[in-house]
């Protein structure tokens, strides 16, 4: 099985459904005998450029380990979900479990406030 980093952007009107979406996608991975190493909810952020006249989106990142069939099923689910406006899957050499630089930065800002 290979390691992947998956980032998907959710339409801002659907932000309240993000936790249910993460559970659904996690279930797809675990049902395919994969594992989830890290889940980060980066929250609603400004987009670098508008996508379909949308200027903000809710970002979520997953680090998973699964086979190609499970990854294909996950990508199909992204493609047919209208709430997911973009997704990106990157193959990694190994599992990444420490917090991302963006999550570390958010933690520092939260502690400083």
UniProtKB/Swiss-Prot annotation:
GO cellular component term of the entry, any: cytosolic small ribosomal subunit
Top-rank taxon: Bacteria
GO biological process, one term: translation
CDD domains named in the record: bS6
Lipid metabolism recorded as keyword: no
Keywords: Ribonucleoprotein, Ribosomal protein, RNA-binding, rRNA-binding
GO molecular function, a single term: small ribosomal subunit rRNA binding
InterPro entries: Ribosomal_bS6, Ribosomal_bS6_CS, Ribosomal_bS6_sf, Ribosomal_S6_plastid/chlpt, Transl_elong_EF1B/ribsomal_bS6
Entry's family note: Belongs to the bacterial ribosomal protein bS6 family.
Function: Binds together with bS18 to 16S ribosomal RNA.
NCBIfam families per record: S6
This protein's name: Small ribosomal subunit protein bS6
Organism: Alcanivorax borkumensis (strain ATCC 700651 / DSM 11573 / NCIMB 13689 / SK2)
């Amino acid at each position: 099985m290979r390691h992947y980093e998956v980032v998907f952007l959710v339409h801002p009107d659907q932000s309240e459904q993000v936790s249910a979406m993460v559970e659904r996608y996690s279930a797809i991975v675990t049902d395919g005998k994969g594992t989830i190493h890290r889940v980060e909810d980066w929250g609603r952020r400004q987009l670098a450029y508008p996508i379909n006249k949308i200027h903000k989106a809710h970002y979520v990142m997953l680090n998973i380990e699964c086979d190609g069939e499970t990854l294909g099923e996950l990508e199909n689910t992204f493609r047919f979900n209208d709430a997911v406006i973009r997704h990106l899957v990157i193959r990694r050499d190994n599992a990444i479990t420490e917090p991302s630089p963006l999550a570390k930065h958010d933690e520092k800002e939260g502690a400083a406030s």
